[in-house]
Amino acid sequence: MHILKKIFSVGAVLLFTTMSFAEQPVFVKEFLGQVDFVKGRLMQLAEAMPEDNYSWTPGEGVRSVGEVYVHAAEANYYMLSLIKGEKFDMNSAESKSDKKTALSLMEKSFDNLKESAAQFTDEDLDKEIEAFGMKFSVRNFMVTIIAHLHEHLGQSIAYARMNGVTPPWSAQE
C-alpha cells in the first residue's frame, strides 16, 4: 500500500509539472483570439464582395480589393518568416488576386499563423529579432502583425462600403 501511495504521488507531480509546462502563455492565447477575430471579419468581407469588385481600386497605384486580401495573406507568411529567421518572397502571389485565390490564400495563411503562434513559449516571446531595420521582441512583433491585419481590415471595410457592400456583421446588427 505504501508503494502505491508513492507511485501515485510521483505520478501526480509529473502530471501537474507536465501540464504547467504545456500551458500556452496568456499573450499567445490573446494573440490567437485577435487572429481569429480579424480572420473572421476579413473572410466574411471577402466572401461578401462580388468577384467583379476584386479588381476595383480607389486610385492609380493603390492596391485593388483582391490585392489587399492577397497582401494580408502574404504578410502573415512574411512576418512569421521574420520571426522564424526564414526567407519568404512577399510578392509571389500578389498578381493572382481573384476571389477564389484570395480566399484560399487568406484561409491557409491564417491557419499557418495560428498553428505556428500556438507553439510559442514565453522564452520564444522574449527572443529578439530584427525586422524593418529595427529590433523587436517576438512578443512586440506579434503586436505589429495584429496591427497590420487590423489596418487592412479597416481598409477592406472602406473598400467594401465604397462599392456598396455592407460588412456582413454590420448588416446583422
Where are these regions (language model features)?
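Bacterial Sec-dependent N-terminal signal peptides
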Residues: 1-25
